[in-house]
Amino acid sequence: MSNTHCVLIGAPVDSGKQRRGCLMGPDAYRTANIEQALADLGHTIEDRGNVAPVPHSNTAHPKLHALSETIGWTEALAGAAENGLSDGLPIFMGGDHALSLGTVLGAMRFAASSARPLFVLWLDAHSDFHTPDTTDSGNLHGTPLGYVTGRPGFVGFPQLPYALPQENVAIIGLRSVDAAERAALQDTAIQRVDMREIDETGIARPLSAFLDRVAAAGGMLHVSLDVDFLDPGVAPAVGTTVPGGATIREGHLVMEMLHDSGLMTSLDLVELNPFLDERGRTAQVMVDLAASALGRRVFDRPTRAY
């Protein structure tokens, strides 16, 4: 990946779950100097500020948390993603994972207009494959992959230009999948890599296989990095902590491989809750990972004093 025009877009989405705090995420990334970290790599940086949801009703839903607001965010972020992709490589600073309902939709629209297939790499402890009908929690941050792959039940959400092909999706880092999602995923073509597979064979092999498919298809690649992909021992600032996650080194390897491939066209940084952080530790880790995805090497990465 040569020098890139990075478009920073704040997505202070806090409607996808009931535990508050992710709305502070964009400012935490800015405070952790994400702009300087990427500029130091030779990239040009444009910070477009924070997106706001399109106007929406505040009508309560008997089962789903903040449905109308989340639909408003989806519409707004889809437009921001399309515009960002027109101008460079958009980096969405979240914000909970419901933001990806919009960012992936926007990437799908842009890919369709460019006559290229879109692929999605989901780095997450969870599969986020629920629908509004199957979620027990009512939290819509657990539904983005269900939405973009065309599962039913997303009444009121923007219409998809097409259903993202299952074989174009890889989820890496799985270690918390509930029974309904497991059953729904079982017969899909989605590539699913859980932590046991990573323990047994390493993280490079399945990622390399997926990237080979993206390259062979001439595809665009949207990467969605959830804080809980990482072990909470190194990234505690997330409301959905699940022990046994990826190590710092595994995280950087993934990002370095993405940079080496030259395939990544957009990036989500999601679920950072600064209210739960330790002196900005997790925000800094996520900034370092973003820098690795944009070309920082091991010997360039500064040692952090936490």
Task: Place the predicted regions along the sequence by residue.
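Solvent-exposed alpha-helices and their adjacent loops that cap or buttress functional pockets
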Residues: 1-2, 111-115, 137-138, 160-164, ...
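Short active-site oxyanion
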Residues: 88-90, 166-170
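A general structural motif
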Residues: 170-178, 247-249
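Short, glycine/polar-rich helix-capping loops at beta-to-alpha or helix-loop-helix junctions
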Residues: 177-186
